[in-house]
Swiss-Prot record:
It is an enzyme of class 2 (transferase). Synthesizes selenophosphate from selenide and ATP. The record marks K20 as: Important for catalytic activity. This is Selenide, water dikinase. InterPro entries: PurM-like_C_dom, PurM-like_C_sf, PurM-like_N, PurM-like_N_sf, SelD_I, SPS/SelD. The keyword Protease does not apply. Belongs to the selenophosphate synthase 1 family. Class I subfamily. Mg(2+) binds at D50, D90, D226. The active site is at C17. The lineage of its organism: Bacteria, Pseudomonadati, Bacteroidota, Bacteroidia, Bacteroidales. GO terms for biological process: selenocysteine biosynthetic process. It comes from the Bacteria. Homodimer.
Length: 348
């Protein structure tokens, strides 16, 4: 079947997870919204986790989440794949298995061929099929800027749930995918990188976090998150606050896409990075070159999992991630200690 050649990037200024609302503003506006109270709710928005969790019985809990955004790449089919992988990632980050999805679509009734929407949905369905989940329908509204994503329901055993609050002092931090997605996509739009770097970024965004989620269960991991629009620092902030620990990150151990550090040194810094640095604020104590700090704040789309694993098993976990053939960039990037003061993110 022929695919559309329409350039989706011509419709947007900000795409992917860089289009998220400023996290500081989001926290402020949600402050006075009352939280539901029920003994069966295991995870709500108070801990800034990747999804909500509701206990059905002693053996099964439901994971519910949603994510959608404007195009992050030119090709409609690829955009569908990336958006679906990004939405499914929240379930994987909680240690679960996606079960059911609904398509969430915004698309103009005029100006863009309807075949473009068909390609987006086909791309999304490819990724959904890879996850083993089932599409149960969806909802589409008329909007001048295309947007696509999923509402996802997953399942997990209540005793195997992975949350922001599960990190313990003494554990090591493992990251499964390289950083630099935001930098690479901005550089692509400016014509600053070649096809090799661009395709590497696309490949990482299309990659499901399924293998990482399965290994989290093998290693008994209970503290993790995925790295998306708030950057590694923003999502690490959620782990540190919910677990009441200090996270120490070795910036030079963090995996990074080719050329992205040199791009940052040359001033190719997406605006979302500055927004994310404001969000972490005084929690961050950084003693590293500026390009590394900006890398850690770079907004990722469909990024990797940041896991906290017992120190004596960290190298084995990384080796298992490498053996999957899907996560060659996986690396130990730091460790957790007891929190002693306001600085809960120490970067060297």
């Amino acid at each position: 079947m022929n695919r559309s050649s329409f350039d989706l990037l011509s419709t947007v200024e900000y795409g992917g997870c860089s289009a998220k609302l400023d996290p500081a503003k989001l926290s402020e506006l949600l402050h006075d919204i009352p939280l539901p109270v029920d003994s069966r709710i295991m995870v709500d928005v108070s801990t800034h986790d990747d999804a909500g969790v509701y206990r059905l019985n002693d053996d099964t809990a439901l994971i519910v989440t949603t994510d959608f955004f404007p195009p992050v790449c030119s090709d409609p089919y690829t955009f569908g794949r990336i958006a679906a992988a990004n939405a499914l990632s929240d379930v994987y980050a909680m240690g679960g298995r996606p079960l059911l999805v609904l398509n969430l679509t915004m698309f103009p009734s005029e100006g863009i061929p309807v075949e473009v929407l068909a390609d987006i949905l086909r791309g999304g369905q490819q990724t959904i099929d890879e996850s083993g989940a089932f599409t149960m329908g969806g909802h589409t509204i008329d909007d001048p800027i295309p947007k696509y994503g999923l509402a996802v329901t997953g399942i997990v055993h209540p005793e195997h749930l992975v949350t922001n609050a599960g990190v313990r002092a003494g554990q090591c931090l493992v990251l499964t995918k390289p950083l630099g997605i935001g930098v690479a996509m901005a550089a692509h739009r400016l014509g600053l990188i070649g096809s090799e770097v661009y395709e590497a970024a696309i490949g990482q965004m299309c990659l499901l976090n399924r293998a990482g989620a399965e290994l989290m269960q093998k290693y008994g991991i209970r503290g993790a998150t995925d790295i998306t629009g708030f950057g590694l620092l923003g999502h690490a902030k959620g782990l540190a606050e919910a677990s009441d620990v200090c996270l120490h990150i070795d910036s030079r151990s963090v995996p990074v896409l080719p050329e992205c550090l040199s791009l940052l040194r040359d001033g190719c810094i997406p605006g979302a990075a500055f927004r994310n640095l404001r969000f972490v604020g005084d929690m961050l104590r950084a003693d590293c070159p500026t390009e590394y700090k900006m890398l850690l704040a770079d907004a990722q789309t469909s990024g990797g999992l940041l896991m906290a694993v017992d120190a004596d098993r960290a190298e084995d976990l990384v080796a298992d991630l490498h053996r999957t053939g899907l996560h060659p960039f996986a690396a130990i990037i730091g460790y957790a200690t007891d929190a002693e003061d306001a600085a809960k993110l120490i970067v060297t």
